[in-house]
Regions:
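An acidic-aromatic
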Residues: 79-130, 205-206
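Short, surface-exposed coil-to-beta transition loops
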Residues: 75-77, 96, 103, 176-180, ...
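N-terminal secretory signal peptides that target proteins for export/translocation
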Residues: 1-6
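N-terminal leader/targeting segments and the immediate start of mature chains
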Residues: 24-72, 227-242
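Bacterial N-terminal signal peptides
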Residues: 10-22
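Short beta-strands and strand-coil junctions in structured, solvent-facing domains, enriched
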Residues: 67-69, 87-88, 96-99, 109, ...
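Gly/Pro-enriched, hydrophobic low-complexity segments
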Residues: 118, 140-235
Length: 242
């Protein structure tokens, strides 16, 4: 396999995927501007309404990862499929094919070029139960994150307020590495347009989504990984976490 920390890759992808299916309740600090708070509340309200109507979702994505100390960002693209509760298919198609499949707590990471599949439990690979609970709809983002207006630019396309999610817990690998998440939504539909994951190390992974389609009746077989007979199965490392 490529020399990637797949526990970090899976953790980042799952946080991103869960943010595509947000279950939000507003929480913010007292010192934030009242006008900004009002706008954030409205975005959260619309996101909640969208979530409640969405049973499955598919989209194209472009990912740009900026690594601290490297001049050029890494760009990739592909497709993502999500179905409640707890099903995810995340396909990288360019510049190379790499697939992540999640069925509740079971995770498979398949790289056809290397004829290997990494298998494990999400709660072990992500060092936290939060991504699994969020993907299954059993938890709210506000239970893991404080939600507040985004400083600086503050607004996205169409003048819609950006949301910043700040981790409440610094326990586990995910809690120690993730500094904040910034969400941008599409005007009118309030589907997620962009998600940016900022790490304490200075690394930034940004995902932009397009061609979103919801409630298409995605079948369970779409989320089943079919492997050739000659693929080597590798067990994922177990991380200690909450």
């Amino acid at each position: 396999m490529k020399k990637l920390n797949w526990t970090c890759v899976v953790g980042g992808v799952l946080v991103c995927a869960c943010s595509l299916f947000p279950l939000l309740t507003f929480a913010a600090g007292e010192e934030t501007d009242e006008k900004a708070l009002k706008e954030v509340r409205e975005v959260v309200k619309q996101l909640q309404a969208r979530y409640e109507k969405t049973k499955d979702l598919q989209a194209d994505f472009t990912q740009k990862t900026t690594i601290e100390g490297f001049e050029r960002p890494i760009t990739s693209s592909g497709k993502v499929y999500i179905k409640r509760p707890g099903r995810l298919r995340w396909n990288y198609l360019d510049p190379s094919v790499e697939d992540i499949y999640v069925n509740r707590d079971d995770v498979k990471v398949y790289v056809p070029e290397h004829k290997q599949v990494l298998v494990g439990k999400l709660t072990q690979m992500a060092a936290s139960k939060a991504p699994l609970e969020l993907l299954q709809g059993a938890a709210k983002l506000e239970e893991s994150f404080d939600i507040e207006p985004t400083p600086g630019k503050g607004h996205g396309v169409g003048g819609i307020r950006l949301l910043t999610l700040l981790p409440k817990s610094r326990e586990g690998e995910a809690g120690r590495s993730l500094q904040r998440i910034v969400l941008e939504v599409f005007p009118k539909t309030y589907f997620i347009r962009t998600i940016s994951l900022y790490e304490v190390s200075g690394n930034v992974a940004s995902f932009e989504f397009s061609s979103l389609q919801s409630n298409m009746g995605l079948g369970d077989t779409l989320f089943d990984l079919k492997l050739p007979a000659d693929v080597e199965v590798v067990k994922a490392p177990v991380l200690n976490g909450p």
